[in-house]
């Protein structure tokens, strides 16, 4: 075996390549007692690899089932495993698993809510995040200020940001009142605060941002804020095939569409909602944990506007079919 250390560790389920590269740069990874350096290759299958002083396996997770969670991130949560200030993170409410850990597929900034995927497969996470894959991300965005046809044309054609050209693949008007307007926008990369910066380049302020789709995976309307659901085999294999990974043959979910299964699903959903409420109550009562949990929205109300364009303002570009 002669592969880069971060690739071997990612395949073994210890994180995404990006996370592991950061650990190596920080001097937290060693090989046979020596601190590893970025770009180092693992030549020996029997090498002793440690992360933060703990010996870790470098064997590929071939026999481990790939799992993917869809999580409804609330505003205010951080996309980090641990926060030194004790603020809430997206990992706080995820289910515990043995022998592996959840890896986030990209990030959402603290003020952004919506769909965030997690997987146990580091290679899947890395490939989905890589810019070359051009995976679409769709957001529901509320902006404050006047939005002209010229501004929309600029956003679709592309504008120069500090880190290069950027553009929306699609812009669709979804309604609004006064100087508050709502749009669905699509991008195919995950640069830091890209949606907000694109709007800001046109002198328009984003007042609310929510991710509603990643590839063909949509945020489930029945999922509460702070809740999660595990993707079924078809959805998992859609993501794997999207980035040219072999499909899985089984899942940890029982997908039999019978009455008993539906009852279990309802029970599971109720348990998730109760767990979310308990977590929020516990956080609110814990000293040193800042911020209140976001207020719950009533279900529905968004999707009905999705295919309608308000009469008072028309987007200059029709959504793609």
Curated annotation (Swiss-Prot):
GO BP, one annotated term: enzyme-directed rRNA pseudouridine synthesis
Residues covered by the S4 RNA-binding domain: 3-68
Keyword rRNA processing: yes
Residue stretches of biased makeup (Basic residues): 263-277
Pfam families for the chain: PseudoU_synth_2, S4
SUPFAM superfamilies named in the record: Alpha-L RNA-binding motif, Pseudouridine synthase
Keywords: Isomerase, RNA-binding, rRNA processing
UniProt cross-references to InterPro entries, sorted A to Z: PsdUridine_synth_cat_dom_sf, PsdUridine_synth_RsuA/RluA, PsdUridine_synth_RsuA/RluB/E/F, PsdUridine_synth_RsuA/RluB_CS, RsuA_PseudoU_synthase, S4_RNA-bd, S4_RNA-bd_sf
Compositionally biased region (Polar residues): 302-321
Region (Disordered): 254-321
Keyword hit for rRNA processing: yes
Residues at the active site: 109 (nucleophile)
EC number: 5.4.99.22
Record field: catalytic activity: uridine(2605) in 23S rRNA = pseudouridine(2605) in 23S rRNA
GO MF term set: 23S rRNA pseudouridine(2605) synthase activity; RNA binding
Function comment: Responsible for synthesis of pseudouridine from uracil-2605 in 23S ribosomal RNA.
NCBIfam families, per database record: PRK10700.1, pseudouridine synthase
Family: Belongs to the pseudouridine synthase RsuA family.
Protein name, per record: Ribosomal large subunit pseudouridine synthase B
């Amino acid at each position: 075996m002669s592969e880069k250390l971060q690739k071997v560790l990612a395949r073994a389920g210890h994180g995404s390549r990006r996370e592991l590269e950061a650990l190596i740069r920080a001097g937290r990874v060693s090989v046979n007692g020596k601190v590893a350096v970025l770009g180092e290759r693992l030549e020996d299958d029997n090498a002793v690899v440690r992360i933060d002083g703990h010996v870790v396996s470098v064997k590929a997770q071939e026999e481990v089932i790939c799992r993917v969670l869809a999580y409804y991130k609330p505003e205010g949560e951080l996309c980090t495993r641990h926060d030194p200030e004790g603020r809430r993170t997206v990992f706080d409410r995820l289910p515990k698993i043995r022998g592996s850990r959840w890896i986030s597929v990209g990030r959402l900034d603290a003020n952004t809510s919506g769909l965030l995927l997690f997987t146990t497969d580091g290679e899947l996470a890395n490939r989905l995040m890589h810019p070359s894959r051009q995976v679409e991300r769709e957001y529901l965005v509320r902006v404050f200020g006047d939005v002209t046809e010229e501004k929309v044309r600029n956003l679709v054609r592309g504008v120069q940001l500090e880190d290069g050209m950027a553009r929306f693949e699609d812009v669709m008007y979804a309604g609004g009142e006064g100087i508050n307007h709502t749009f669905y926008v699509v991008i195919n990369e995950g640069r830091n605060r890209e949606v907000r910066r694109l709007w800001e380049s046109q002198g328009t302020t984003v007042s609310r941002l929510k991710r509603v789709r990643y590839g063909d995976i949509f945020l489930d309307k029945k999922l509460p804020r702070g809740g999660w659901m595990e993707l079924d085999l078809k959805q998992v294999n859609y993501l794997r095939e999207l980035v040219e990974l072999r499909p899985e043959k089984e899942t940890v979910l029982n997908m039999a569409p019978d009455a008993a299964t539906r009852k279990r699903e309802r029970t599971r959903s109720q348990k998730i909602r109760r767990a979310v409420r308990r977590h929020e109550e516990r956080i609110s009562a814990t000293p040193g944990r800042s911020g209140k949990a976001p207020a719950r929205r009533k279900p529905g109300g968004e999707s009905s506007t999705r295919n309608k364009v308000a009469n008072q303002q028309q987007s200059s570009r029709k959504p793609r079919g």
